[in-house]
Regions:
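Conserved catalytic alpha/beta core of Sir2/sirtuin-type deacylases, generalized to analogous enzyme cores
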Residues: 1-144
Length: 144
């Protein structure tokens, strides 16, 4: 949602909760790249005149169906699945690690505190992702 993965160079992203740096029409759900600067707040869709909004999933809204299906497929075909920094409480996204487990993947959870997922995963690592992930990468890439 915050665009950090894309700015880090990742090209193959499934943004289940959207992207704060994209805009869409409130009524038509169509992406809007640009609009006339009329000074109106919020800005209006150049196609239909309705208000524009960030292209994110707000509480109570459904996840984008195509993106969710792609994420489900990725989870079901993964060899290793990382669940990082999530409460593991909000479905349907919280189901993804369980799909990976059911398909035989190694599931690694990284979180400051245990979650409902913790007892089910292959590895539950409690701590800050900013500390644990660099340590994992260093360990994987260290010479034998």
């Amino acid at each position: 949602m915050d665009g950090l993965h894309r700015r880090a160079g990742n090209q193959h992203l499934l943004e289940l909760h959207g992207n704060l740096f994209r805009t869409k029409c409130f009524s038509e759900e169509r992406p809007v790249e640009s609009w006339p600067d009329s000074g109106e707040i919020p800005p209006r869709c150049p196609h239909c005149g309705n208000v524009l909004r960030p292209d994110v999933v707000w509480f109570g809204e459904s996840l984008p169906v195509a993106t969710l299906h792609a994420a489900e497929h990725a989870a079901a075909t993964a060899e290793v699945f990382f669940s990082i920094g999530t409460s593991a409480l909000v479905y349907p996204a919280a189901e993804l690690p369980f799909s990976a487990l059911a398909a035989g993947a190694t599931v690694v959870e990284i979180n400051p505190h245990p979650t409902p997922l913790s007892a089910h995963v292959s590895y539950s690592l409690n701590g800050a992702a900013g500390v644990i992930l660099p340590a994992l990468v260093a360990r994987v890439w260290e010479p034998a």
